[in-house]
């Protein structure tokens, strides 16, 4: 997948530069190289135009993944359209120490974890079991890469930006659309220079 992203990057950026008539920021390069359908015939106005994007990856945490996966199951698909992972970390309360807390969560949320694992296995979704790590750190260490675009059902999804990935937290419905091979609609973001 990473090779595919980099293979289309130069052409997408070149096309976007010609359309906009200006140099692009790193964020704009990522946005223009992840357009649904591959390219555009016009520049997009920041903060005004709604644009369809094709993210490279999705990450879901266990609390929000439940409804997202139930909705995906209704889509009639046999497999997710883009690499997707479920991370079991939010239903584990930190109270008494890792061993005790994990045992408690596995008991209290066993049905949820079993459901998530079963659905993940059925639809080709990566499953990170309870105790495997916190979603935003696992994503950073295993899936983030410069120039990529991902969405995640966790407010810390943006952590993947530390490696140059455009990573945005979304609701479960947005994640389901991308899992089901539909575009992800977003108002072309305003950019702040730092």
What are these regions (language model features)?
Residues 63-72, 104-116, 184-186, 190-194:
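Glycine-rich, acidic/polar active-site loops that bind/position phosphate-bearing ligands
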Residues 37, 58-60, 91-93, 133-135, ...:
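Short, glycine-/Ser/Thr-/acidic-enriched flexible segments
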Residues 18-21, 57-59, 102, 144-156:
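A short glycine/serine-rich beta->alpha loop
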Residues 11-13, 52, 92-102, 120, ...:
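Gly-rich Lys/Arg/Thr-decorated short loops/hinges at beta-loop-alpha junctions or inter-strand turns
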Residues 5, 62, 145-194:
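Mobile "lid/hinge" segments at catalytic clefts and subdomain interfaces of large enzymes
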Residues 1-88:
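N-terminal amphipathic, basic-rich helices that act as targeting or association modules
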Residues 79-151:
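Anion-binding (especially nucleotide phosphate/pyrophosphate-binding) glycine-rich loop
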């Amino acid at each position: 997948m990473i090779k595919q992203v980099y293979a289309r990057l130069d052409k997408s950026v070149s096309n976007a530069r010609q359309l906009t008539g200006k140099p692009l920021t790193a964020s704009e390069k990522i946005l223009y190289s992840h357009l649904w359908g591959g390219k555009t015939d016009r520049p997009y106005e920041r903060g005004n135009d709604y644009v369809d994007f094709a993210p490279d990856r999705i990450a879901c945490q266990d609390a929000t993944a439940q409804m997202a996966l139930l909705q995906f199951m209704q889509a009639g698909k046999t497999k997710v359209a883009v690499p997707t992972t479920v991370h079991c970390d939010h239903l584990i309360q930190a109270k008494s120490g890792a061993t005790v807390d994990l045992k408690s969560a596995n008991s209290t949320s066993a049905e949820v974890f079993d459901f998530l694992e079963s659905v993940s296995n059925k639809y080709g979704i990566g499953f990170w079991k309870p105790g495997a790590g916190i979603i935003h750190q696992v994503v950073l260490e295993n899936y983030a890469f410069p120039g990529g675009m991902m969405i995640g059902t966790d407010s810390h999804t943006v952590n993947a930006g530390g490696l140059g990935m455009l990573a945005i937290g979304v609701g479960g419905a947005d994640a389901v659309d991308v899992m089901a091979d539909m575009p992800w609609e977003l108002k072309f973001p305003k950019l702040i220079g730092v």
